[in-house]
Design a protein with these regions (language model features):
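Short structural boundary motif marking the start of a folded domain
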Residues: 1-3
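Acidic, low-complexity, intrinsically disordered interaction modules
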Residues: 7-65
Length: 65
């Protein structure tokens, strides 16, 4: 399973997102649920609530393979 997270505060770059389980990033601006985001990242695991809060991410849910 893969999980998507959006980055509303800064682009997805080293130090701005968790490293563990990171599969892919995209730095295209997007607007999930009408919220401006600098990009997205996909993980092979669900991030903890603490990680989501610490890195100020938005949970985008499970990604269909």
């Amino acid at each position: 399973m893969r999980y998507r997270y959006y980055c509303p505060e800064r682009p997805p770059m080293p130090g701005a997102i968790p490293k563990k389980g990171l599969l892919e990033t995209g730095d295209e601006m997007c607007w999930p649920d009408d919220v401006f985001c600098w990009g997205w990242c996909i993980y092979d695991r669900k991030l903890t609530d603490a990680e989501v809060a610490e890195y100020e991410l938005i949970d985008g849910g499970q990604v269909d393979d």
